[in-house]
Amino acid sequence: MTLALAAIACMLSCSKDDSKEPSLNKTKITLYVDETEKLTYSGNDECTWSSDNKRVADVNNGVVTANHVGTTTIHANNLACEVIVKPRYTSFTEPYLEFGSSKSEVKSQMSGYTLKSEDNTMLTYYGKGNVDNYAYQFKYGALEMSAFYTELSCSLSLSDFLLERYLVFDSEKSSTERIYTLVSVDLKMFIQFRVGTYGCIVMYTKA
């Protein structure tokens, strides 16, 4: 009788342990680019880790590494943790980037800036802070390209700003300038960063 009761107790105990609900120690984390944080999975089953967008943040055995500015989700089996990656460099304000927008929509978004020039295919504005000018190019009435201009002295800080947000796709160098082609973390936008004696130009187009 004693052995039978002990066996039943053991079976009940094992059943209780086996039914333990899996859990993740955090469901949302915020990191700066290049920071890491360890997530802990608790459960009886083996954990498989994955990231919805490794270009934003990757995970290796629970250690999350922030790669570029953006938001993604880390999965631990069927559990999830939202990861928000924030920038360290915020010295520049990018232009309006909703490609396909009308000229009136762009004007509305740039209402806080002074219009510099306008024609059928272009809008330019005086910038603020580290940005000298903004430019918008239209094709068939729809926004096709956005750009901003800065002084050459801003090239290093602008490079840091862009590398936190975008992936380098290609680069080339001539006697007068350097040209870097980057792509957004969602692979939907190309960015061209040009540096020369004239200063710095950053141009954005739809991929």
Predicted regions: what they are:
Residues 60-73:
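Extracellular/luminal low-complexity segments enriched in Ser/Thr/Pro
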Residues 10-13:
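C-terminal motif of bacterial Sec signal peptides marking the signal peptidase cleavage site
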Residues 15-36, 54-55, 68-69, 77-164, ...:
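Short helix/turn-capping signatures at newly exposed starts of structured segments
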Residues 58-63, 120, 175:
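Short, solvent-exposed loop/turn segments in extracellular or other extracytoplasmic domains
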Residues 1-2:
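Bacterial N-terminal signal peptides that target proteins for export
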Residues 164-183:
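Short Gly/Thr-rich strand-loop-strand
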